[in-house]
A protein has these predicted regions:
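A glycine-rich (often HGG/GG-containing) alpha/beta subdomain
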Residues: 1-149, 153, 157, 333
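C-terminal-of-GTPase-core extension/linker across diverse P-loop GTPases
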Residues: 2-10, 14, 148-267, 284-286, ...
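Short beta->alpha junction loops/turns
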Residues: 25-26, 94, 255, 312-313, ...
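Switch I (G2) and immediately adjacent beta-strands of P-loop GTPase domains
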Residues: 54-67, 72-76, 256-284, 302-305
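Conserved beta-strand segments of alpha/beta enzyme cores
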Residues: 111, 272-274, 358
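Short glycine-/small-residue-rich Rossmann-like dinucleotide-binding loops
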Residues: 244, 279-280, 304, 311, ...
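Generic enzyme active-site microenvironment
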Residues: 275, 309, 335-338
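Inter-motif core of Ras-like GTPase G domains
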Residues: 289-313
Length: 461
């Protein structure tokens, strides 16, 4: 990536809207926009005060045609999103206007930004670290208020400060040890292996404290996948509609109505839940329905929690017995549906076939048992409602993995000390932990890995 060129991209989602935004960043941002922006003020944008808003029109530099009436927002570096000169052109929303303005900018020598390049520039220019850059994606993807709160705290630098404090303690220890190893003749107080061990113990405790937040953090960030499975006409779609409190899935008496999986998000006591209504599982010669059945089985394998809906008004079918065997000993809820009708299956009959988290009698069509389902899901994932915290929290798999590896390196150094290994070997493990922590914030991460991470971003961000 070249930081000496100027980039542009549409920053708003495609479609019809009140406002469309084209973002421009780089050393020529003010000059390029100035060539196409006409306002009553004769002062060039580059000479105007930063963090100001200006009204005018975008005019094609070759044809003289007015493209749109706009507002231009001027933010000069380093006090901008990218820490470079940034100009945002706010025009009328829609497909045509934003594209035409972007085309004119590109014709003036500006380069089309890559995915995530604005945020990547903010990172490379030192305005944010990698955890904060990733938090921006998490804010965009947040499904609940709690997951948003976790992401905002991370963007504010809560996690970064915690990691940097750990790194500072480790590098101070490394520096002292390496000086005593490299310059034994100097009058520097030598540190014993036992003193190193004593110094590492509180650092390991802090790592354990942070790792203890990982399950809760990941849950708030990613949520849980709940797959609703069962035979056709068991009431899966009725259950989904009752949970969503809307008619999202079509409900009929015809078996095989749901031929593909329907996916929705909802929040249950602060937990983002990815709810998937799958096709009814049965033997069928219908090609489309059989594809839906296969997908249902795939979701069964991937699910964090399986909800098996059984029509309690009919005797247990062979396919249902097979499904019960498949989900036994997994986080699972068995719903004996159609409680408003005469029941042919008792809870005891199901319990005899395996170990399940909960067996509940409901009537999805009548909306009975929905509160109980919410309680069961919540207790399954965390033993109660999950709240965000203002403290540092691990929620990203990459961060969790690197923190575990860093702790493992320090554990190795403790073992090396207890085994009487020389100090220079002990320092190697401590330095490895320091570098792994740097990978979390991006201070020691390879450029290729940085490139890969920013590919997750959209254009214009």
């Amino acid at each position: 990536m070249f930081l000496d060129d100027t980039i542009a991209a549409i920053a708003t989602a495609p479609g019809i809207g009140g406002i469309g935004i084209i973002r421009v960043s780089g050393p020529e941002a003010c000059d390029v926009v100035n060539r196409i922006f006409h306002s009553k003020q004769s002062v060039p944008l580059g000479d105007r005060q930063t963090r100001t808003i200006h009204y005018g029109h975008i005019v094609h530099p070759k044809t003289g045609k007015t493209l749109d009436e706009v507002i231009v927002v001027l933010m000069k570096g380093p006090h901008s999103y990218t820490a470079e000169d940034v100009v945002e052109i706010q025009c009328h929303g829609g497909f045509v206007s934003v594209r035409e303005i972007l085309k004119v900018l590109l014709s003036e020598g500006v380069r089309q930004a890559e995915e995530g390049e604005f945020t990547k520039r903010a990172f490379l220019n030192g305005r944010i670290d990698l955890t904060q850059a990733e938090a921006i994606i998490d804010i965009i993807d947040a499904k609940t208020e709690q997951s948003l709160e976790v992401a905002v705290n991370q963007l504010d630098g809560t996690l970064s400060k915690y990691i940097r404090a750990l790194r500072d303690e480790l590098i101070a220890m490394i520096a002292h040890l390496e000086v005593t190893i490299d310059y034994p003749e100097e009058d520097i107080e030598e540190v014993s292996a036992q003193e190193v061990r004593t110094g590492l113990e509180p650092i390991l405790e802090k790592m354990d404290t942070l790792l203890a937040t990982a399950q809760r953090g990941k849950l708030l960030r990613d949520g849980v996948m709940v797959s609703i499975i069962g035979r056709p006409n068991a009431g899966k779609s009725s259950l989904m509609n009752a949970l969503l409190r809307e008619d999202r899935a079509i409900v009929t008496n015809i078996p095989g109505t749901t031929r593909d999986s329907i996916e929705e998000f909802l929040t249950i006591q602060g937990i983002p839940v990815r709810l998937i209504d799958t096709a009814g599982i049965r033997e069928t010669e219908d090609i489309v329905e059989s594809m839906g059945v296969e997908k249902a089985r795939q979701y069964l394998d991937k699910a964090d929690i399986v909800v098996l809906v059984i029509d309690g008004s009919k005797p247990l079918e062979p396919e249902e017995q097979e499904l019960l065997q498949l989900i036994a000993n997994r986080p699972s809820i068995i719903f004996l549906n159609k409680a408003d009708q005469m029941q042919c299956i008792m809870k005891e009959e199901i319990a005899a076939l395996g170990t399940f988290t909960e067996i509940v009698t409901i009537s999805a069509a009548q909306g009975e048992g929905m509160d109980e389902m919410a309680k069961v899901i919540t207790s399954l994932v965390q033993g109660g409602s999950v709240q965000a915290s203002h403290e540092a929290m691990l929620s990203n798999v990459r961060h969790i993995t690197l923190m575990e590896q860093a702790k493992s390196s320090l554990d190795q150094s403790i073992l090396a000390i207890d085994s009487g290994m020389p100090i220079d070997l002990i320092v190697t493990d401590i330095r490895a932990a320091w570098e792994l922590l740097g990978d979390i914030t991006g201070e020691s991460l390879r450029e290729s890995m940085v490139d890969e991470l920013f590919k997750r971003f959209c254009l214009g961000k």
